[in-house]
């Protein structure tokens, strides 16, 4: 481990902007893949939030809920049901974010059970890890754009199917006006 050339390790450490020098080269070698896995876990956490938001947007945009309406630019029609609006952009964002959530596991599986040192296996981590930053940024940008253009159905509670949603509030109101709880309920 290390180098067979007489390097000034202090100067190299300073030139590269590291705070301290790793005196134990074995420790430095044993860290391969660990930092990437930690960062990948942060990426996966953000992606999980975006995927859940995308799922909710798809659900709440559906005709069964209709809580929100997505702009036409973010949807496509169905060949068999032209009136249907498929939330393509949110569906693709959800899939991309779900893919990003697999990144820590991919890194773990590649780096797992390798002996100390550098092996070509670790090259595959870079192929997965480095593009993930751009992929996450694209998802963040797309969600930011979509959220700003979602229309909320402000009159959804006028629908009779939601009458029971506020039944507890109605019971409490009746109790406060003197109706016994059992009668109010």
Predicted regions and their residues:
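Internal glycine-rich alpha/beta core junctions
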Residues: 1-110
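Glycine-rich cofactor/substrate-binding loops
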Residues: 66, 81-185
């Amino acid at each position: 481990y290390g180098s067979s050339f007489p390097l000034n390790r202090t100067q190299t450490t300073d030139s590269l902007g590291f705070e301290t020098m790793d005196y134990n080269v074995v420790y430095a070698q044993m860290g391969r893949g660990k930092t990437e896995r930690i960062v990948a876990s942060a990426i996966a956490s953000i992606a999980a939030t975006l995927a859940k938001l995308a799922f909710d947007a798809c659900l709440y945009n559906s005709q069964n809920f209709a809580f929100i309406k997505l702009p036409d630019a973010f949807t496509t029609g169905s060949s068999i049901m032209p009136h249907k609006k498929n939330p393509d952009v949110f569906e693709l964002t959800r899939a991309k974010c779900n893919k990003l959530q697999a990144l820590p596991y991919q890194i773990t599986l590649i780096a797992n059970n390798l002996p100390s040192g550098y092996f070509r296996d670790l090259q595959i981590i870079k192929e997965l890890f480095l593009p993930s930053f751009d992929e996450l940024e694209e998802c963040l940008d797309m969600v930011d754009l979509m959220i700003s253009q979602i229309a909320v159905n402000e009159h959804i509670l006028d629908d009779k199917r939601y009458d029971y949603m506020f039944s507890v509030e109605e019971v409490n109101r009746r109790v406060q006006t003197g109706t016994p709880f059992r009668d109010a309920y």
